[in-house]
């Protein structure tokens, strides 16, 4: 019997496991998913936790309940991948053999890479950090809020811009918007990562008095004086700092010598096989793919990988290809949203701003558990 091992119980790994369990007969393959915690977390909800619009408990479910019964769930942390021997070693000493391996471990937050980050900055890229940010926002009575990113790449590129819009909406509802200066700092030449959508976001910022500075790449934080310094030589003071932390690829990828300088796993952008080892697939945030690091990308990639593994195990040509498709929603506040859909060949069409796409995001947040991990959509 063939053995498929999947590392990571996020959206991508869960979909791959469930699709394989659906497509392959029990005698064809044993499907094992390895996850460190056994808890599946809906990360797009973190920003809503920070702004008191989401119950944290509703963002977490048991991974076992999301998997088909025949998928074997192993609780443990992968610490080494021996690609030549086709083995994965876990922290407790167990070793798992595989015929096909799927790496879906996401990105790793590394705030210690930027001195001063832990003392000075807040963020919403983990549940704990979102709850701390919520407390900081509740206590904030006025001053300058700076929103920026420590470095690129990072998960969910639109998230910082979205957070700036949420800050405006949040402080307006509290009746203290006139006492708050929101300043958005972008490392790019524009405020929004997707160029076709940037003019719309600039208009939103202008309408709601959100200041912006481009070409601001963070060099250091002076936590004592509350000043942020850029590589370009600018300095910006703050009273509250919200900063996306530095990211790296999965630690096991780095420790196994499989990653690039950032720890990202070099992956073919169409087949999603790793470039050095065709029997290892990778998807989502842990890869070096030229697409957004987002759950929506992993969602579409998972289906390609599942089809390819089924073909491999049955001795058939693997013809499935990933076209770079990503779809995401951005909440602009005031019950207005932006929907963006794009792929390698088709950039996003500048969308209208309206209620429909805001409702689309709200619907997805609520329907995620029913529709996405199972691979139904």
State what each model feature region is:
Residues 1-72, 151-195:
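Beta1-alpha1 glycine-rich phosphate/pyrophosphate-binding loop at the start
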């Amino acid at each position: 019997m063939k053995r498929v091992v999947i590392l990571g119980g996020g959206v991508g790994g869960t979909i791959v496991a469930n699709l394989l369990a659906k497509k392959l007969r029990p005698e064809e393959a044993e499907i094992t998913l390895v996850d460190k915690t056994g808890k599946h977390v809906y990360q797009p909800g973190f920003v809503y936790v920070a702004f008191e619009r989401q119950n944290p408990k509703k963002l977490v479910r048991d991974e076992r309940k999301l998997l088909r019964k025949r998928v074997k769930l192993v609780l443990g942390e992968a610490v080494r991948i021996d690609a030549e021997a086709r083995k994965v070693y876990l922290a407790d000493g167990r070793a798992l053999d595989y015929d096909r391996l799927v790496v879906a471990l996401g990105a790793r937050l590394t705030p210690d890479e930027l001195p001063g980050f832990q003392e000075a900055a807040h963020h919403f890229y983990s549940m704990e950090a979102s709850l701390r940010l919520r407390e900081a926002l509740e206590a904030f009575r006025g001053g300058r809020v700076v929103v920026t990113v420590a470095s690129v790449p990072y998960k969910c590129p639109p998230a910082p811009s979205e957070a700036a819009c949420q800050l405006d909406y949040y402080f307006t509802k509290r009746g203290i918007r006139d006492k708050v200066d929101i300043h958005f700092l972008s490392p790019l030449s524009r405020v929004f990562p997707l160029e076709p959508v940037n003019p719309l976001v600039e208009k939103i910022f202008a309408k709601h008095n959100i200041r912006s500075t481009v070409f601001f790449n963070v060099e250091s934080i002076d936590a004592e004086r509350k000043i942020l310094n850029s590589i370009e030589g600018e300095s910006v003071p703050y009273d509250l700092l919200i900063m996306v932390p530095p990211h790296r690829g999965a630690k096991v990828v780095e420790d196994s010598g499989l990653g690039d300088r950032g720890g990202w796993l070099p992956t073919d952008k169409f087949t999603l096989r790793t470039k050095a080892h065709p029997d290892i697939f990778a998807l989502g945030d842990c890869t070096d793919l030229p697409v957004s690091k987002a759950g929506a990308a992993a969602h579409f990639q998972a289906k390609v990988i599942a089809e390819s593994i089924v073909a491999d195990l049955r001795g058939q040509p693997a013809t499935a290809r990933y076209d770079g498709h990503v779809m995401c929603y951005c909440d602009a506040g005031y019950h207005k949203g932006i929907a963006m859909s794009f792929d390698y060949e088709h950039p996003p069409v500048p969308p209208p701003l309206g209620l429909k796409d805001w409702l689309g995001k709200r619907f997805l947040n609520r329907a995620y558990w029913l529709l996405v991990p199972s691979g139904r959509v």
